[in-house]
Design a protein with these regions (language model features):
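Helical "lid/coupling" subdomains associated with nucleotide-phosphate turnover
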Residues: 1-45, 60-62, 67-234
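Active-site-adjacent helix-turn-beta-strand microarchitecture at beta-sheet edges
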Residues: 52-58
Length: 234
């Protein structure tokens, strides 16, 4: 009904992508924007962790062919909302962050139960990461500079610890942080970005540790790059 309305009122044809199509477009976007395409084609296993605002999609490719995808209904926007929504005036920021970390581990149990067998491999899994939290974690500004940055699991853990220290020094209670971000306090945009990183990055760490992945490569390209490349070359 909505798609029909858009077509009739705006004259635009809109198509909703299936999981496989979205995963393929995401990986095509990464390839399209990467310099060392030959090296990438030699990777036997490639995993894409695409963390959006509402969910996180984990997709696996083997020798260039799509294997499977799994959607974890936790994204950075959901986690940020829960960080504040589940807190009271007496909830410390430490307690609130511990809650979101626990929630990630809890939701990942279903992923492990349903999908872990697909990801078990003696060969290393080349991992591509997409999303605001992971691109911000590069410490670089602009998608072009962020694209292709390699982050080790240890470096991501260090980033989480650094964010923890900074946020907890400045805000004792979760409500204090919420008030600052919501009402546009000093550097509120930067603080909000730190919150997004802090709640989003543990998802990558948990997946990397469980699957034995030592490092990942950040993609600074959007899904539309993949759609464009598919239409350009097909």
């Amino acid at each position: 009904m909505i798609l029909k309305c858009i077509r009739e009122e705006a004259g635009l044809n809109v198509r909703i992508l299936k999981k496989e199509e979205e995963a393929r477009a995401t990986i095509d976007a990464f390839f399209f924007s990467s310099h060392d395409k030959l090296s990438l084609t030699k990777k036997k296993y490639i995993m894409v962790i695409d963390q959006g605002g509402g969910s996180t999609e984990v997709s696996l490719f083997k020798e260039g062919e799509y294997v499977s995808s799994y959607s974890i209904n936790l994204g950075t926007e959901v986690l940020r909302t829960l960080l504040f929504k589940e807190s009271t005036n007496q909830t410390t920021l430490r307690q609130a962050l511990k809650m979101t970390d626990h929630l990630i581990k809890d939701r990942l149990e279903a992923f492990y139960k349903n999908m872990l067998a697909n990801f078990e491999s003696e060969e290393p899994i080349y991992t591509i990461a997409v999303g605001t939290a992971i691109t911000k974690a590069t410490g670089k500004k602009g998608n072009a500079k962020q694209h292709g940055t390699i982050l080790s699991v240890d470096r991501i853990i260090e980033k989480i610890a650094s964010l923890d220290d900074d946020l907890k020094k400045r805000y004792t209670y979760a409500g204090d942080l919420y008030h600052h971000v919501r009402h546009g306090g000093t550097r509120s945009d930067q603080v909000d970005g730190d919150v997004v990183m802090r709640v989003g990055l543990p998802m990558f760490v948990e997946l990397m540790k469980k699957l034995g992945i030592e490092e990942l490569t950040v993609s600074g390209t959007g899904l539309w790059y993949g759609i464009y490349s598919q239409n350009l070359y097909n």
